[in-house]
Amino acid sequence: ELYYFLGIEVIQTRVGIMISQRHYILNLLYKFGMTECKPMTTPLERNLKIDASSGTATSESIQYHQLIGSLIYLTITRPNLSYSVNLLSQFMQNPRNLHLNCTKRILRYVSTTVDYGILYKSNTTIRLEGYTDADWAGYKADRRSTSGFVFSLGSGAISWSSKK
């Protein structure tokens, strides 16, 4: 019986199969000193406007790079983080304190949703569904659009993306 695969937990129940990265999240919170952090109900502030020149330069760019890389890996089982992580990954070249604070906010959100993952229900009709959305030039700094999609088979996502 499969329990772990490439750091992803595989939980088999009567309802179906769930993939999760609970253990990875707990290690991530420990690594970045956020095991006792204040919980958040959303990954980012609502209507957050952020660009490459927001705030002051951070002296912790290595930590920022590590956080973004870790969060990108986490999107394997947490597609709900894709937009936020994609937005913040655009500032890898010159991260600012605001960008670092936003990545830490995502970790605070993740700390409250540790048990989230993707559930593939065993009694669901197998049907391929796709959804897409775009903000059409929503990023004011360069007037570029952000678009995204998700495809699900049965009850669980099988492919997703968010791109600028």
Language-model features: where?
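Short, conserved secondary-structure transition motifs
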Residues: 3-17
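Divalent metal-binding acidic/histidine catalytic loops
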Residues: 12-14, 20-164
